Amino acid sequence: MALKLMIQGTASSVGKSLIVTALCRIFKQDGLKVAPFKSQNMALNSYITEEGLEIGRAQAVQAEAAGIKPSYHMNPILLKPSSDKKSQVVLRGRVYENMSAEEYFKFRPKLLELIKEDFDFLAKRNDVVVIEGAGSPAEINLKEKDIVNMGLAELVNAPVLLVGDIDRGGVFASIAGTMLLLDEKERNRVEGVIINKFRGDIEILKPGLKMLENIIQKEVLGVIPYMDVHIDEEDGATDRFYTKCAQGEVDVAIINLPHISNFTDFDPLTKVPGVKIKYVNKGERIGDCDVLIIPGTKNTIGDLKVLKDYGLDKEILNLREKGKFIVGICGGFQMLGKVIKDPYHIESDTEEMEGLGLLSIETVIEREKTTSETKAFLGEELPDTLSSLKGLFVTGYEIHMGESYILGKGKHFSIVVERNKEKVKVLDGAVSEDGRVFGTYIHGIFENSLFTKEFINIVRKEKGLTPLEEVINYREFREKEYDRLANIVRNSLDMERIYQIMERYRDK
């Protein structure tokens, strides 16, 4: 059976996902077969495996760092909030049903067998399984029948390392307080703590570390510095939405929808020379930009209503009149059409809502979800404005409940030629007659370096700017970032001690 290690945190966003990613790469570098595992993930940022199954993006990133293909076994339960009160429950990569919190808590104990089966599947096929907890193990109102923190650690008999975020302030109190709220059996399972996101002189920190060890009777296994690494984040709890950039040569505005999903779609754009990204948050104006992107969302009708309530629809139409480029991805693509219908109330109580009217499509939210790894061809139907995109193949993935239908003489954006390794021929997306508005269901399209370069060069040419010769290969860039992350974390942690802890639990 594999070695096991579980990373838990004092709160959400303390760095659990990133540390698990780093450990996966470290163990890979050490010649071990390693797999990540998170029993239950709540996130709108998801990923589609090559079998067409949906998991949390964090586990896909961790698998990539481990050098293996993502699998539904790594994240058997995915919760995708669709409103303030309900979440879509995805089990082993497939939609189960929408549930309220109360309904899910009653249902949750039935999932233990499924969780154990998937963990054992990984443990039998790997040398190490690195487990990620969720939120905090000290949420005392949720501890009963826990399946994601200490309950999971006990189920699979894994040692726990507790992570605290010093950048937030109060790290000693958060670690000591967490330990206080654990029962004796749970405290005994915590084998050490990690201080994350440290800035400054570590010598000043050392006396505090010694005092903390005396208080909690656990060793500090390392202090990880604040890291500026470019690796996909798990969910929307991120600073990216509130970072304001100076004006660039090409300014791209992205609307931060209330239920934004797969926001990592736009990370490759941040690596394109001369491109500046700004997120338009609730209550803010779009302002001037060269490209406006409306991203994916878990609640298209609800988010479109919010967009209209804040008057952003008028700003979008104004940008259209100015000849700016407007791009929609998945739910954002649906919003650009004439109408969105939800006859089965999958996402909303509203059966129908008028769209922005910028593309000749009608969307119907269906009961069945399309999930696939996708390859598509950008054909001759594209207008001359986008002529440099003609003939390109792009890869990405689809996750959508809706189906969109071209109206009248409207034109599609691409032809899907492959889904989950099977040959198909399916029309995707839509494009306006002048090519300045287009939408697609394909997430990850900007990870295609040639597509991104050609599209940005179209904008640059219109502004009289020199075209880019090349843009960074984002997939190669990610690989280098995994190695850089692993080197920082390896040099910050007592890896010899961590190996000893894992070996000790192998025999328990």
UniProtKB/Swiss-Prot annotation:
Domain of life: Bacteria
Pathway: Cofactor biosynthesis; adenosylcobalamin biosynthesis
Molecular-function GO terms, alphabetical: ABC-type vitamin B12 transporter activity; catalytic activity
Any one Pfam family match given in the protein's UniProt record, by short name: GATase_3
Sequence ranges assigned to domain GATase cobBQ-type in this UniProt record: 249-451
UniProt entry keywords in alphabetical sequence: Cobalamin biosynthesis, Glutamine amidotransferase
Keyword Iron among UniProt keywords: no
GO biological-process terms attached to the record: cobalamin biosynthetic process
Annotated active site: 330, 443
Family: Belongs to the CobB/CobQ family. CobQ subfamily.
Stated role: Catalyzes amidations at positions B, D, E, and G on adenosylcobyrinic A,C-diamide. NH(2) groups are provided by glutamine, and one molecule of ATP is hydrogenolyzed for each amidation.
Protein name: Cobyric acid synthase
Biological classification of the source: Bacteria, Bacillati, Bacillota, Clostridia, Thermoanaerobacterales
Gene this chain is encoded by: cobQ
